[in-house]
Amino acid sequence: MAKEDCIEMQGTILETLPNTMFRVELENGHVVTAHISGKMRKNYIRILTGDKVTVEMTPYDLSKARIIFRAR
């Protein structure tokens, strides 16, 4: 899928789920399930509850997302 089709949003980690999945609350109040992108996994970026993250979502399934950045 092309990068232009993705929707980027800011959110906060609510809870950690098994298999590097996370429950993320977006700025607009929606709660989605997100997984870590491959580059973050490769570089061992640690994500904890309460972290501010940037997620990208596809327009086809708005209940799932990919975490692409963790704010400092």
Swiss-Prot record:
Any single GO CC term annotated in Swiss-Prot or TrEMBL for this entry: cytosol
Chief site of localization: cytoplasm
Gene name per UniProt: infA
Family: Belongs to the IF-1 family.
Oligomeric and partner information: Component of the 30S ribosomal translation pre-initiation complex which assembles on the 30S ribosome in the order IF-2 and IF-3, IF-1 and N-formylmethionyl-tRNA(fMet); mRNA recruitment can occur at any time during PIC assembly.
Highest taxon above the source species: Bacteria
Gene Ontology terms, MF aspect: ribosome binding; rRNA binding; translation initiation factor activity
Domain S1-like residues, every copy: 1-72
Source lineage: Bacteria, Pseudomonadati, Pseudomonadota, Gammaproteobacteria, Pasteurellales
Coiled coil (UniProt feature): none
PROSITE patterns noted in UniProt: S1_IF1_TYPE (PS50832)
Record protein name field: Translation initiation factor IF-1
Known role: One of the essential components for the initiation of protein synthesis. Stabilizes the binding of IF-2 and IF-3 on the 30S subunit to which N-formylmethionyl-tRNA(fMet) subsequently binds. Helps modulate mRNA selection, yielding the 30S pre-initiation complex (PIC). Upon addition of the 50S ribosomal subunit IF-1, IF-2 and IF-3 are released leaving the mature 70S translation initiation complex.
Gene3D superfamilies assigned to the protein according to its UniProt record, in alphabetical order: Nucleic acid-binding proteins
Keywords on record: Cytoplasm, Initiation factor, Protein biosynthesis, RNA-binding, rRNA-binding
Cysteines engaged in disulfide bonds, as pairs: none
PANTHER family in UniProt: TRANSLATION INITIATION FACTOR IF-1, CHLOROPLASTIC (PTHR33370:SF1)
Signal peptide per UniProt: none
InterPro entries: NA-bd_OB-fold, RNA-binding_domain_S1_IF1, S1_domain, TIF_IF1
Compartments reported by the entry: Cytoplasm
